[in-house]
Design a protein with these regions (language model features):
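Short boundary/loop segments of OB/S1/cold-shock single-stranded nucleic-acid-binding domains
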Residues: 253-270
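Short helix/loop capping segments that flank catalytic or ligand/cofactor-binding pockets
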Residues: 3-5, 70, 90-93, 124-128, ...
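Extended, domain-scale alpha-helical bundle/helix-rich regions
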Residues: 14-41, 45-253
Length: 427
């Protein structure tokens, strides 16, 4: 049912499990779940569900944080179980299943395993992430983990960018989760038998196998149950119904993490949004000049995370700084197309916020005009490029201060008009 609803929604400062619980809460009994995770998941500053189903949205962060899920079925109901350790899932009824070799038409009424084949699969044994934190621009952010597999080519590395973390410790956790997810693709066991009570996401201990090392506890990854009724076979009536089960197992001592297979939505190009902020303010920014915006697709009147604002120049105590003000329509890009990483790159006019000088009548005029904070004044710097009417105009709403550390040169080829309405002092 979660695949039947798509949404655009913003979550602020919530852990992955809290976000999932919030989504599930809209479905009532249809999304009954049991959170058995034990890890302390950090709050995520900003997480966007962007043009994706609820199912995809909750699955994606589970894969990021290494949370597995399975279902427990009962008469007339089912429950989703979330776990981040194998021991957190249920043990099957009876706990153990004997290995019994069958021959011919031999059938057993007791639940057992009669076919068991260990398999090996090639899996990468090294993972690496890298990311960048603008609050710590020189910090080491290269996270890497390596497994213990000793076979040839086991050291092939899975490297990707960005890792979507702000601290190296979190990056190391993500690298470990990714490593465990790929290592868990190896050492699977394929089994068959008469055990209809085995279900995906349960624990079972095998006994009586002639190879002693195989008599251990397993996590059931997949179970396929086939029932055949003799009453429906051609030319026959009555007879004995039969059952055959196929199971995929893994040693329960091997951490099981889901592979990252759910694609993260990609924002295709820039969007516009309106600047928002504190009630009664015109300008709302933090120490980095970051602002808040509200996207047009947002139906909850929510706001984004603090977004950095691109400037024409930016470096240590020099460069440019213009803070977009509340109500402005701004252009927003997304780093790597990630809806969780907005970046304001400019601003645009609209029908409710038109330029000072009407267009196209003043198309030769280039203007930079500000607005006095919580007032009606302005500062302005304008170039008029109309042939024969070229002009550079400046307007200071209050004071105009010029500081020259060496020589000041002024050359006027014709008239120089200097008018002072008050006092003029020369020091």
């Amino acid at each position: 049912v979660l695949s039947q609803r798509t949404d655009n929604y913003i979550f602020h400062d919530m852990s992955v499990t809290d976000i999932i619980a919030d989504v599930f809460s809209d479905y009532g009994a249809l999304a009954e779940f049991d959170d058995r995770t034990s890890a302390a998941y950090p709050p995520i500053e900003y997480c966007v569900q962007y043009r994706e189903s609820d199912m995809a949205f909750v699955t994606r962060p589970m894969e990021d944080f290494g949370i597995s899920y399975s279902f427990v079925h009962a008469d007339g109901s089912h429950k989703l179980v979330m776990s981040d350790q194998n021991m957190q899932v249920d043990t099957v009824e009876g706990a153990t299943r004997k290995f019994i070799t069958l021959s011919g038409q031999d059938r057993r009424t007791e639940e057992c395993i009669h076919h068991f084949v260990p398999e090996r699969r090639f899996a990468s044994g090294k993972t690496a992430w890298k990311d960048y934190n603008f609050k710590k621009p020189t910090a080491e952010m290269h996270a890497q983990k390596e497994g213990t597999a000793s076979y040839e080519q086991a050291g092939k590395e899975l490297y990707d960018w960005p890792g979507r973390y702000m601290e190296l410790g979190q990056g190391q956790t993500f690298a470990q989760i990714k490593l465990e997810a790929h290592e868990a693709q190896d050492k699977r066991c394929m089994a068959a038998g008469n055990s209809p009570s085995l279900f995906a996401g349960s624990l079972m201990t095998l006994t009586d196998h002639p190879v002693g090392a195989r008599n251990i506890e397993y996590l059931v990854l997949r179970s396929q149950h086939t029932f055949t009724s003799q009453n429906y076979r051609s030319g026959g009536s009555g007879g004995t119904d039969s059952y055959e089960g196929q199971y995929e197992l893994i040693d329960s001592a091997i951490p099981l993490r889901p592979l990252k297979v759910t694609p993260k939505p990609v924002v295709q190009g820039p969007q516009t949004a309106f600047v928002v902020g504190k009630q009664g303010e015109e300008i709302d920014c933090d120490e980095y000049g970051r602002i808040l915006v509200r996207f047009h697709w947002d139906r909850e009147n929510d706001q984004s995370m603090r977004c950095r604002v691109a400037q024409n120049w930016a470096y240590k105590q020099w460069g440019g700084m213009i803070i977009p003000r509340i109500g402005m329509e701004v252009m927003v890009e997304f780093l790597d197309g990630d809806p969780d990483r907005p970046l304001v790159t400019g601003s645009v006019y609209n029908a409710d916020a038109m330029p000072k000088y009407a267009l196209p009548a003043n198309k030769t005029r280039s203007t930079w005009r500000s607005n006095s904070h919580k007032s009606k004044g302005f500062n302005e710097f304008t170039f008029e490029d109309k042939t024969g009417g070229e002009n550079v105009f400046t307007h200071a709403q209050k004071d105009h201060t010029t500081r020259v550390l060496n020589t000041r040169t002024a050359r006027v080829d014709k008239h120089d008009v200097y008018s002072v309405g008050g006092n003029r002092s020369v020091e």
